[in-house]
Amino acid sequence: MGVLENIVPGELYDANYDPDLLKIRKETKIKLHEYNTLSPADENKKSQVIRELLGSCTDNFIIEPPFYCDYGSNIYIGDNFYANHNLVILDGAKVVIGDNVFIAPNVGIYTAGHPIDVERRLQGLEYAMPVTIGDNVWIGGGVSIIPGVNIGKNSVIAAGSVVIRDIPENVVAAGNPCKVIRKITEKDSTTTNYRK
């Protein structure tokens, strides 16, 4: 997959018409179709198909179908990873996800972006920036993470957030655009009532 290695983070490349990239994406779609339509009872086959797709993973992870990505080979997931249904990862650049990360349904992790000016956008040009998610992060349902974002370890991203900037470690962040709401404190480890 040398053509993917030639993509320089933040620099424009031909994502829409490059025949090598189109071929890789088609092969990825075929594997994803197989993965997303396998019986839940066929755990061994599901594991084999997803492992062929990802850049790296451990033995201990779950990605609930349906799952979608552009290439798969730019996705690196840590140990004890769980992703609920409808995870979308546009992985023109690396997506590195740490250990013990939980992702709720309908989350989008996007490394791909397009030029603002219409001329270059219509030429099929785009750029890609890596996304990194630290250990022990929980990402709520419906979150969107844009190109180039880093989320620090132990943080929580509230449902529906749009993460456009880096989020530090050990915080709760929410909103559109996503902002730090508060630090995670010792009190959080003793809370038993989560009603509002």
UniProtKB/Swiss-Prot annotation:
Q: What is this protein called?
A: Putative acetyltransferase YJL218W
List the residues marked with site Transition state stabilizer: N84
Q: What is its EC number?
A: 2.3.1.-
Entry GO terms, CC:
mitochondrion
Catalytic center at which residues? Answer: H114 (proton donor/acceptor)
UniProt-annotated binding residues for acetyl-CoA: N84, G141, A159, I164, R165, K179, R182
Subunit (UniProt): Homodimer.
Q: Pfam families recorded for this chain?
A: Hexapep, Mac
State one molecular function term (GO).
Answer: galactoside O-acetyltransferase activity
Keyword match Transferase: yes
Is Repeat among this UniProt entry's keywords? yes
Q: Which organism is it from?
A: Saccharomyces cerevisiae (strain ATCC 204508 / S288c) (Baker's yeast)
| Keywords on record | Acyltransferase, Repeat, Transferase
As for family, the record states: Belongs to the transferase hexapeptide repeat family.
